[in-house]
Amino acid sequence: GGCQQNGSATIVDVKVGDKVSNWNGLGVQLTSLFNIDTAPAQAGYEYIAVLVTVVNRTKNQTFNIGAQNLAEINAAYPVPPQENVDANFHALAAASTDFSASCDGQSVECGANISLYNSNSQTFSDSTNLPPQGTGYLQLMLMVPKGWKQLSVTYMPTFAADKTMTFVMTAADVTRA
């Protein structure tokens, strides 16, 4: 990858499998990306999901990440049914202002939320934030043109001004079911 100076302004080129142990209190590993079975209404596009393992290494700082109105989006456009996937996605993407994505040079929509891990119940639940010492997944959902080659997602955290982290993926990275 590129420059991986922890704590500096920018980390570029975090690729699948890459791990960043502590970046402004956040640990990440770009875990996987895969196709989502549901096809978007927009012809010539497909949905893909990107999972990033995340851990909050701070003792007392909560990190708000992704859409902050998750409950409202899921109440307005519950999934299932499948008919609500597009509306849910567009609302999620519009609310995920701390993420931007581009695919083969063109801007694409990207929705983001946290899936928190509860070690007591050994379950995951959707969340708007990552609490101190919390772990889970950052779930990114993107709508990309079919036949895409390269995808980059830039994260601009609300808790660390003027710092960005960019995840870079290629179509070859997609996990085939």
Where do the protein language model's features map onto the residues?
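Bacterial signal peptide processing site
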Residues: 4-5
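Low-complexity, acidic Ser/Thr/Pro/Gly-rich terminal tails and inter-domain linkers that flank the onset
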Residues: 11-45
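Envelope-exposed proteins and targeting segments
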Residues: 24-29, 44-52, 97, 136-138, ...
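A mature extracytoplasmic/lumenal domain signature
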Residues: 32-34, 54, 58, 66-69, ...
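Short, solvent-exposed beta-strand/turn "edge" segments of beta-rich domains on protein surfaces
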Residues: 33-49, 61-64, 129-131
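The feature marks short-to-medium sequence segments in extracytoplasmic or secretory-pathway proteins
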Residues: 55-132, 176
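Surface-exposed edge beta-strand/loop patches
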Residues: 102-104, 122-177
